[in-house]
Amino acid sequence: RVRPENLRGLFEIRPHASYRGFWKFDGFQESGYLHLDVHWEFNTSAEIHTGYNFTRAGVISPFEIVPGVEVPAGTYDHGELALNYVSNKSKPFSFELRTVVGGQFGGDRLSLTPTLKYRIGETFRSELSLNYNDYDLPYDGGQFTASLARLRLSYSFTPKIQLQALVQYNDTSDKMGTNIRFSWLGSANSGLYLVYNEVDERGVGGLPTGREFIVKYSYIFDVFS
């Protein structure tokens, strides 16, 4: 990392690189991801991330990326430009915008993910995000968009008692999922968990197609004491 002096409000420059890949036992590479990035942090605590990714996707058998659009088997090598803006996270309101432009599965993809966050101290946290993807693939029906909207809420009654909620909507499948979790923790994340899950088949206002209620309790003790 580099901390320049008197450079237009720039506080720190953090270049970095990483790689991850997965192979089957027969040597076939299922995925590869080489990430080259530079984080530019300003005196205001805002950040801009400028990166480039080299990707590899190994598709063993054809699959439907969305209903009616099939991606053939093969190995797809692409590059993508990644730009990310993050405002000051220490403020009650913060904003993040992630943009990715590049190739995927033999075609092109534009991905935009704006995220708005609001918090009240360490007690209440909320996060609203939208993941929008615009695809242009060289297959029948390969021009389409797909979006996933998420709302996260968290309230801490005490450091060990929390109520959390996640609501997300997928416009491709027109499904809405809801997850509500209450946790009363002891030591080492043991304790009581109450979880409610629901999936609505036809989006907002649709009838639920799946519901489940989960109760989990764990307790850690020392058998030698």
Language-model segments: residues:
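Exposed, low-structure sequence patches enriched in small/polar residues
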Residues: 1-225
